[in-house]
Amino acid sequence: MKSQPVTQELHFIFPLFKTISSDIMSFLVSIAGIAMLAQIVLGTFANVFIVLVTCTDCIRRRKLFLADGILTSLAFCRIGMLWVILISWCSIVFHQALSLQVRFSICVGWAVTNHFNMWLATILSILYLLKIGNFSNLIFLGLKRKIKSVFIVVLLASLVLLFPNLITVTVCETVQANGYRGNLTGKTKRTYFMNLTAMISFTLDNIISFTISMVCFLLLIYSLCKHLRTMRLYGKGPHNPSASAHIKALQAVISFLLLFSMFILSLIISGYNYMKPLNEPVHLICQLIGTLYPSSHSYVLLWGNRRIKLAFVLAMVQVRARLWLKEEKP
């Protein structure tokens, strides 16, 4: 007799608990969506500002410096990547059924923008090392003299890793689109195999890029320590232009490595949960964390470049002054 009221209470509690947990998850998804949109807007603003400043200076000087060219290309890639992420996010959250051609376009667009975003940032790390690093090694000096050729070779070599990524992404999307025609076991095996292949190809591409940037970072630290030791030997203080250039380069590279690590980790976690629907919280949170990399690192580059930083500060001062004048008017 006593067990019947308990059973009735449990039948009442479980649906209530399920409703509360569903409401909490929808609230968290909404917060993540707002944060995602804010990151994309701020990241797009920073990258557009970098493009405008570098292009304006290029037109005024009638000359494009190598660093400005890399920064501009990187900014364009990040703008494209952020908007591809936004389109993908909206299609997942709002349950929009996309055609196969649109899904192909999103996957290919993401693969291309992610690849060049990653390798242009790596080339920027190499530029910092070759421009600021101080080594007497013959190989280093030879690379420093042929810096443009080094970048062309690195960029062309990275294309060797891009094509396998494009092939695996395209085949994976085709298998997922046509998987419903076969039996469930065959579909699951094909999807697992293609996702595993795509993850291996993507991880290989990222590990090579990450390793090159890490080597540049370690060599910059060694060069800075060597420079500070020389300054101490000659009785000079540590605060000098060369040390400041080393520190700024290290800040840019370490921020890239940290944000890039978070980006890779979020994609790996999302990849291992491929069996779950894309609107599950694990995928949405991974996308939110992954968006930090292309949006936040642009502000680090903006603040580390003296010319772009000055233009940014002046623009903010002008905006603030105009707002103040509007408030003062009766």
Curated annotation (Swiss-Prot):
Xref: InterPro entries: TAS2R
Annotated signal sequence range: none
Glycosylation sites: 183, 195
GO annotation, biological process: detection of chemical stimulus involved in sensory perception of bitter taste
Location(s) in or outside the cell: Membrane
Entries under CDD domains matching the protein: 7tm_TAS2R43-like (cd15027)
Protein name as catalogued: Taste receptor type 2 member 136
Biological function: Putative taste receptor which may play a role in the perception of bitterness.
Family: Belongs to the G-protein coupled receptor T2R family.
